[in-house]
């Protein structure tokens, strides 16, 4: 069974990297060994330094794009801090690359520090114009339906499925343009994946690791109480369907 990790991160040697220790590694070579062990073919990356600080977002996007172009396993989410106008121009110039999956936003306090509702129209109208995916860390989830309905050419992945809000907004979106992913620790709940598949269908759920153990994340789907077709959709088919040009060789 092929696997595409649509949502992960890594450090890049920046002073704004996230600390790692013996218990949780965030460096690229370690993550690639995890990929090999678990049979993951490729990942959609953004640098931690671009998400947890607003100081090197432009530089991080540029550096990661170079890495993606030189490594078949690496695909990119372009990080957008909507307070920085230069990033809109950068993203516009890179979005058509076969190594780019879309836009990543991280509004939370301690990260880019903005009110998602204050900047939502600016972000999502831009994505609507580009007809691209936006991957967001969960923030004011129930408010996102209005923007998905307002900007139907934008597709929104609200990451880290963990509860009823994720499921309900997927059901409520008028144009079917809200999705979620399995990344993060919350998927360890023993019925969250199964319940989400029952309610919204496996076609709305992407696989991601978020740098949590690939063995745990892949095992959570492989041994879930869902059909083989549902497992294939989450682990591979959905990414392949929605990112045809990017993953055409996988």
Which stretches of residues belong to each language-model region?
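Mobile, glycine- and charge-enriched loop segments
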Residues: 1-21, 65, 72-79, 176
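Mid-to-C-terminal alpha-helical segments outside catalytic/metal-binding sites
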Residues: 1-10, 17-42, 202-204, 214-250
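Alpha-helical scaffolding within the catalytic cores
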Residues: 25-33, 58-64, 86-92, 142, ...
């Amino acid at each position: 069974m092929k696997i595409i990790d649509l949502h992960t991160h890594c450090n890049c040697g920046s002073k704004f990297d996230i600390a790692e220790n013996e218990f949780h590694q965030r460096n690229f070579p370690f993550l690639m060994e995890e990929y090999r062990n678990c049979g993951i073919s490729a990942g959609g990356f953004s640098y931690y330094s671009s998400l947890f600080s607003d100081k090197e977002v432009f530089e991080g996007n540029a550096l990661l794009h170079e890495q993606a172009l030189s490594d078949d396993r690496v695909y990119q989410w372009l990080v957008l801090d909507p307070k920085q106008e230069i990033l809109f121009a950068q993203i516009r110039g890179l979005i058509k690359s076969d190594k780019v999956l879309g836009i990543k936003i991280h509004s939370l306090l301690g990260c880019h520090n903005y009110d998602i509702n204050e900047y939502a129209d600016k972000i999502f109208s831009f994505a609507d114009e580009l007809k691209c995916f936006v991957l967001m860390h969960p923030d004011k989830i129930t408010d996102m339906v209005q923007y998905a309905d307002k900007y139907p050419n934008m597709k929104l992945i609200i990451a880290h499925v963990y509860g009823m809000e994720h499921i309900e907004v997927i059901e409520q979106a008028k144009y079917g343009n809200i999705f979620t992913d399995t990344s993060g620790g919350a998927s360890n709940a023993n019925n969250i994946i199964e319940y989400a598949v029952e309610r919204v269908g496996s076609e709305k759920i992407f696989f991601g690791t978020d740098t949590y153990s690939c063995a745990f994340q892949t095992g959570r789907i492989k041994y879930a109480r869902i059909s083989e077709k549902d497992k294939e959709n989450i682990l591979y088919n959905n990414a392949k369907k929605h990112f045809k040009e990017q993953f055409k060789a996988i």
